[in-house]
A protein has these predicted regions:
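Active-site helical microenvironments for divalent-metal-assisted chemistry
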Residues: 1-99
């Protein structure tokens, strides 16, 4: 996993966003993005791996995510978001305009 200040911030957001969530097997959900991030070799890949489920699972963290990520990273996160409907919310659109 690539480590930097931004990766640490992404990790903190991911931990907060997935706090108390479990996967289908009953394991803490945070293990999934951490496992993906372990395979990454760049800062950008690592940040996207850590945050890839945050937009759909924890929309309360939109602001933190958008303030942290680059335009390219946000594009990747949007592509990975399964629930595209949440991306239409006025709050999310407002954050996109700030970029």
């Amino acid at each position: 996993m690539y480590y930097s200040k931004r990766v640490k911030e992404a990790m903190q957001i991911a931990y907060k966003a997935h706090d108390g969530q479990t996967d289908k097997g009953g394991y803490p959900y945070i293990a999934h993005p951490l496992h993906l991030a372990e395979r990454c070799t760049s800062e950008e890949e690592t940040i996207v791996a850590l945050l890839h489920d945050v937009l759909e699972d924890a929309p309360a963290y939109y602001k933190e995510v958008v303030e942290l990520v680059s335009k390219e990273e946000l594009d990747a996160l949007v592509l990975l978001t399964k629930k595209k409907k949440i991306l239409i919310r006025p709050t999310f659109q407002k954050y996109l305009k700030m970029l």
